[in-house]
Regions:
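Conserved catalytic alpha/beta cores of large enzymes that bind or transform nucleotide phosphates
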Residues: 428-456, 589-624, 734-782
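Active-site cores of enzymes that catalyze phosphoryl transfer or operate on phosphate-rich substrates
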Residues: 433-538
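Catalytic or ion-translocation cores adjacent to nucleophile or general acid/base/metal-coordination motifs
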Residues: 387-435, 503-544, 549-634, 706, ...
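Long, charge-dense tracts
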Residues: 16-439, 443-446
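Short, glycine-/Ser/Thr-/acidic-enriched flexible segments
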Residues: 371-373, 402, 551-553, 698-701, ...
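Long, compositionally biased intrinsically disordered regions
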Residues: 21-220, 259, 630-857
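Compositionally biased, intrinsically disordered low-complexity segments enriched
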Residues: 4-16
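Generic recognition of flexible, low-complexity loop/linker segments
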Residues: 350-356, 531-536, 543, 676-683, ...
Length: 857
C-alpha cells in the first residue's frame, strides 16, 4: 500500500469539515457532498442492525427489527442476497408439513387468495408444490473478501471470511470484556484504534494466511474510523446507490458483534447520548477487505476486484429477482399459519366456560401474559371456579431498576423498550412492629454481613485466577469442589434458589424485602392508580389478589435469563410483584386512591407470588406480613395450587420425555432434578410454540385449551372509553410479543446465522456478553438448537403472531394510524391483526377489515 497516496486521499476527504456551511470552491462542495453521502450510507447500514442484550439481561429480540419498515418478503430478499440468511421456513420443512397434512390443499388455496401479489402474478397451487422440490433460486452477492479468496492454497487454510471473522471477533471479545479478564485492555481511543494496534502487534494471522506485508499495510491505515470508512468506499469504486447495501452486507458477516454494538447504541439512546462502537466495527470490517486487496495486489486479485464491481452494479436487479422468487415462500409461510389459525378460530368461537359471577370470586390471580402462564391459568380455573385469573405484562407496569442489598449490581426490571424511572432497593424489615432505629440497625447489620461474605468470595475467586495458582490452587483447594461435583452427578431436588439473596446470612433472608425508593405519597398514589387501571383492577376486587410473576430454574445454563420474564428484562418477576404488593397494601396509598375514586376494600390483600415455569410451582413472599384473614385464605388455597400445578406438569410431561402417569410427588421430583441438573440442556421449552396473542376479556378464552401457545392479556374495552389502554397494549406488550415471536421464528428458520448453535459447545464471552460456539467465530445470538429441537423434531413452528383483539374497529384503526411502528408491523406482514366480531372474526388486510368465518376453516 502506498502510504503517501493513502494520506493524500485522507486529507482530500477531510479538508472539508462535515458541518461546513459554505464550501470555498466547487471542488470543496463536491468533497462535502461525497463526505455526507458516505456518512449517510454508513449510518443507514448501522441502523439496519437490531440489538442483542447480554446474557444476564437476555430478552427476545426480532433480529429483523430495524428492517420492519419494509414488507417481510422484501426483508427476506435483502437478508438472502446480502447475508445468505433465510427468513422464511426452509422449503424442505414446508414439504414435510405438506406431506404430513399439517398444511392442507384448502390452506394453500386460501393463502393464494389472501396474497394480492400471488393473485396478480397468477401463482397456482401446482407451481407452489413443484417449487418445494428445490431451494429458492436466490444468489448471494459476494464481498471483497470472498472474491479475493481465489489463490491455490485456499483449500488448505481457513477461508478469508472465516479468518477475518475470527480475528475481528477475538478483538471484540478482548475489548468489550469487563468481567472475565483481570488485565483489562486500554479502551480510551476506541474500538477501531484498539483493533488497529492489536493487528500491528499480532503477526500470527499474517503468517497463517500467507500475508507477509500485512503489518505494513495495517500501519498505513487511516488512524480514525471515519477516515477509514471513506477511504475504503473510495477504493471500492462501487456505485453510490449500492453503498448502504454493501455496508450492510459487510456488517452481516459479523452480525453477532454488530448486534452487541447495536445494543450499546440502544442503551445510549435511552440515556440521551450516542455510541460510536457500531460505526467503528463497520470501519474495521471494511478495512479488512481492502487490506487483503492491497496485500494481494496481483493480476488475479485485480480480476476478482472487477468481478465484485460488476456484481454490485447489478445489485438492485438481484434484489428484485430475489423478492420475486421468494413469493412462493411467502405463500407457504401463510399457508402454514392458516393451518394454525383454523384450529384457533374453532376453539375461540365456542368458549368452554362463560365465567363466574363477580360476587362468587374469592381470589384473583394476575399472571404475566407469557404463553407458559396459559396452562396454569386454565388449570386453576378448572380446579376451583372461585378463582379469576388475569393476564398482564409481567413487570406489572412498574418502570423500575433494582439494586440488591449492599451491592452496586443495578439492573433494569422492565421491558427493553423502556428506560427505568424508579429505583427499587432492599429494606430489612421484621414483621413485628419496631421502631425506626431498630429497623435501621437491622439494615446496617445485614448490609455489613453481606458485604463481608461477598468480599471473601471475591478474594477466593481472585486467588484462583492468579497465574501462579494454575496447579497449586487446584491441588490445595480441589477437594472443596467434590460437593459440587456430587451435585452434578446426582442432582438434588430442592426448590428454586433466590440468587438475589446470595451472600446474605439466613437470619435476614426472610425479612429482606424489595421496595420502591424516593417516591413521595402523591407519586405512589399516582403510580398505583395507573397500574390498577391498566390491569383492570380498579373495581370488583376479590378479598385475596395474587400478583404472580414468573421465573425459570436451571443449572449451568448461560442462557438462563432467556427463560425468565422478558418484560422484566430477563429477570424473574419477584421484585416487581413484591414492590407492587407492598405499594397496594400501604394504607396511606389506599387512602390517597380513595380521593381519586379508586376504593380498595379494607378486606382486600395483595400477595406477591412467583410461578416457577420449569416445575409449575407457585411460591409466595412476605407471608409474615399478611393479616390473619388473608393468611387463612392463602393457606386454604394451597390444595388448589398443588392440584393445578400437578395438572400442568402432566400436560407438559410428554414434551420432556417424562411419563404423565407418574405419581404427582414423583413427577415434581423429576422436574426439580432436571432443573438442578448441570448437564440438562432442555430444562424447559420456554416460549417454543408461541403463535397467538389475545387482547380480550378472560371470558373470551376461559376454559379454552390453547396449548401453551398463546399470550393472554386481559382487556375490557367498556372500561377504556378513550382507548388509552388499548393504545398502550398495542405499542408495548404487542411489540414485546412480536419480538419474542420473531426471535423464535428466526432461530428456527436459520439456526446457523440467527441462532446460537449447539448449547453443549458454548463458551461464555466476557462474563455476560454472549457465547461463542466452540472457541471462535462470530458472537452467537438467538436461541440454541436445544431450545427449539428435541433431537427428533422441531418444538417450535415458525409462525408469525396472530393478534386477536376484542375492541371497536375504530379504536384499533386509530392506534394503527397514530403509531408508525404498529402500522409497519401490520401493513408489512410481520404479524396478523384480527378482531373479535359479532359474527366471528375479522382480519386486517391492506387497510380493510375482511370477515373470517368459522366455516372458512
Amino acid at each position: 500500500m502506498d502510504t503517501v497516496a493513502t494520506n493524500a486521499l485522507t486529507d482530500a476527504l477531510t479538508d472539508v469539515a462535515p458541518g461546513a456551511a459554505h464550501p470555498a470552491t466547487a471542488q470543496d462542495a463536491d468533497a462535502l457532498h461525497l463526505h455526507t453521502a458516505m456518512a449517510e450510507a454508513c449510518q443507514q447500514a448501522c441502523q439496519a442492525i437490531a440489538p442483542a442484550w447480554p446474557l444476564d439481561r437476555a430478552i427476545a429480540v426480532n433480529p429483523h427489527w430495524a428492517r420492519t419498515g419494509m414488507p417481510v418478503r422484501q426483508v427476506a430478499a435483502r437478508m438472502a442476497v446480502l447475508g445468505g440468511i433465510q427468513v422464511f421456513p426452509a422449503r424442505a420443512q414446508q414439504l414435510g408439513a405438506w406431506q404430513a397434512g399439517r398444511i392442507t390443499p384448502a390452506d394453500l388455496d386460501q393463502a393464494l387468495r389472501q396474497l394480492p401479489q400471488a393473485q396478480a402474478q397468477g401463482t397456482t397451487a401446482q407451481q407452489c408444490t413443484e417449487a418445494l422440490q428445490s431451494g429458492a433460486p436466490v444468489a448471494q452477492l459476494p464481498l471483497l473478501i470472498d472474491v479475493l479468496d481465489n489463490d491455490p492454497r485456499r483449500h488448505t487454510r481457513l477461508s478469508w471470511r472465516q479468518a477475518i471473522t475470527h480475528q475481528v471477533s477475538q478483538t471484540c471479545a478482548a475489548y468489550f470484556d469487563e468481567h472475565q479478564a483481570d488485565w483489562q485492555p486500554q479502551r480510551a481511543q476506541g474500538l477501531y484504534a484498539f483493533w488497529r494496534d492489536t493487528l500491528q502487534h499480532d503477526h500470527g494471522i499474517g503468517l497463517l494466511m500467507g500475508l507477509p506485508d500485512l503489518g505494513a499495510a495495517v500501519g498505513a491505515l487511516p488512524e480514525r474510523a471515519e477516515d477509514a470508512e471513506r477511504w475504503v468506499l473510495q477504493r471500492l469504486g462501487l456505485p453510490q446507490p449500492v453503498w448502504a447495501d454493501y455496508l450492510e452486507a459487510v456488517l452481516l458477516t459479523v452480525n453477532g458483534w454488530a448486534s452487541w454494538c447495536a445494543y450499546l447504541g440502544w442503551q445510549a439512546g435511552l440515556e440521551g447520548r450516542t455510541d460510536p462502537h457500531l460505526r467503528e466495527l463497520l470501519a474495521i470490517r471494511l478495512a479488512w477487505g481492502v487490506l487483503l486487496l492491497e496485500c494481494k495486489n496481483d493480476a488475479a486479485s485485480q480480476q476478482a476486484f472487477a468481478t465484485l464491481q460488476r456484481a454490485w452494479r447489478g445489485a438492485p436487479q438481484t434484489l428484485q429477482r430475489a423478492e420475486d422468487a421468494l413469493l412462493i415462500d411467502e405463500v407457504w409461510q401463510l399457508a402454514l399459519e392458516i393451518g394454525y389459525q383454523r384450529e384457533l378460530v374453532q376453539r375461540l368461537a365456542y368458549p368452554a366456560h362463560p365465567g363466574v359471577p363477580q360476587h362468587e370470586i374469592e381470589v384473583q390471580a394476575a399472571f404475566c401474559i407469557d404463553v407458559r402462564s396459559e396452562p396454569l391459568r386454565r388449570a386453576l380455573e378448572a380446579v376451583w371456579p372461585g378463582i379469576q385469573t388475569l393476564g398482564f405484562a409481567g413487570f406489572f407496569g412498574l418502570p423500575v431498576a433494582y439494586t440488591p442489598l449492599a451491592t452496586q449490581a443495578r439492573r433494569p426490571q422492565l421491558p427493553g423498550l423502556l428506560a427505568p424511572a424508579i429505583e427499587v432497593t432492599d429494606r430489612v424489615l421484621s414483621a413485628a412492629p419496631t421502631g425506626v432505629a431498630d429497623d435501621g440497625a437491622l439494615q446496617g447489620s445485614a448490609s455489613r454481613a453481606r458485604q463481608g461474605r461477598l468480599a471473601l468470595t471475591e478474594r477466593w475467586q481472585s486467588a484462583s485466577r492468579w497465574p501462579g495458582a494454575a496447579f497449586s490452587f487446584v491441588e490445595a483447594a480441589g477437594v472443596s469442589y467434590l460437593g459440587k461435583l456430587g451435585q452434578w452427578m446426582k442432582p438434588h431436588t430442592r426448590a428454586r434458589a433466590r440468587d438475589d439473596l446470595h451472600g446474605l446470612p439466613a437470619r435476614y433472608r426472610a425479612i429482606c424485602r424489595p421496595q420502591m425508593a424516593g417516591l413521595d405519597l402523591d407519586a405512589k398514589v399516582s403510580l398505583a392508580a395507573r397500574v390498577l387501571h391498566a390491569m383492570g383492577l380498579n373495581q370488583h376486587l376479590a378479598p385475596l389478589v395474587l400478583l404472580v410473576g414468573h421465573g425459570s430454574q436451571s443449572a449451568n445454563n448461560a442462557h438462563a435469563a432467556a427463560l425468565d420474564c422478558g418484560a422484566c428484562c430477563g429477570q424473574t418477576g419477584e421484585v416487581n410483584a413484591r414492590s407492587l404488593a407492598h405499594l397496594l397494601n400501604d394504607s396511606a396509598v389506599r387512602q390517597g386512591l380513595r380521593g381519586q375514586g379508586l376504593d380498595i376494600p379494607d378486606g382486600t390483600t395483595f400477595v406477591a407470588c412467583l410461578h416457577n415455569t420449569t416445575t409449575d410451582e407457585i411460591e409466595a413472599f412476605d407471608l409474615d406480613l399478611l393479616p390473619p384473614a388473608a393468611r387463612e385464605r392463602w393457606d386454604g388455597l394451597q390444595p388448589v395450587l398443588a392440584h393445578a400445578g400437578d395438572q400442568v406438569r402432566r400436560e407438559r410431561a410428554p414434551t420432556l420425555a417424562l411419563d404423565a402417569r407418574t405419581p404427582h410427588a414423583a413427577l415434581l421430583e423429576q422436574l426439580r432434578r432436571r432443573a438442578n441438573d448441570g448437564a440438562q440442556t432442555r430444562p424447559e421449552w420456554g416460549l417454543a410454540g408461541n403463535a397467538a396473542f389475545l387482547i380480550a376479556p378472560r371470558q373470551r378464552s376461559r376454559g379454552v385449551v390453547l396449548g401453551g401457545r398463546s399470550f393472554l392479556h386481559d382487556y375490557d374495552a367498556s372500561q377504556d372509553a378513550d382507548g388509552s389502554v388499548l393504545e398502550l397494549l398495542m405499542t408495548a406488550p404487542m411489540v414485546v410479543t412480536h419480538w419474542i415471536n420473531w426471535q423464535y421464528h428466526a432461530s428456527t428458520c436459520d439456526p446457523e446465522r440467527l441462532g446460537s448453535g449447539n448449547k453443549v459447545l458454548h463458551n461464555v464471552v466476557g462474563g455476560t456478553l454472549g457465547v461463542f460456539e466452540g472457541n471462535g467465530g462470530d458472537l452467537r445470538i438467538g436461541l440454541s438448537r436445544q431450545s427449539l429441537h428435541d433431537g427428533q423434531r422441531w418444538m417450535h413452528e415458525p409462525l408469525r403472531l396472530t393478534v386477536v383483539i376484542d375492541a371497536p374497529q375504530a379504536a384499533i384503526d386509530a392506534v394503527i394510524a397514530k403509531h408508525a411502528v404498529v402500522s409497519q408491523l401490520v401493513e408489512g406482514g410481520w404479524l396478523h391483526m384480527w378482531r373479535f366480531h359479532e359474527s366471528g372474526f375479522v382480519r386486517y388486510a391492506q387497510g380493510i377489515w375482511m370477515p373470517v368465518l368459522v366455516t372458512e376453516f
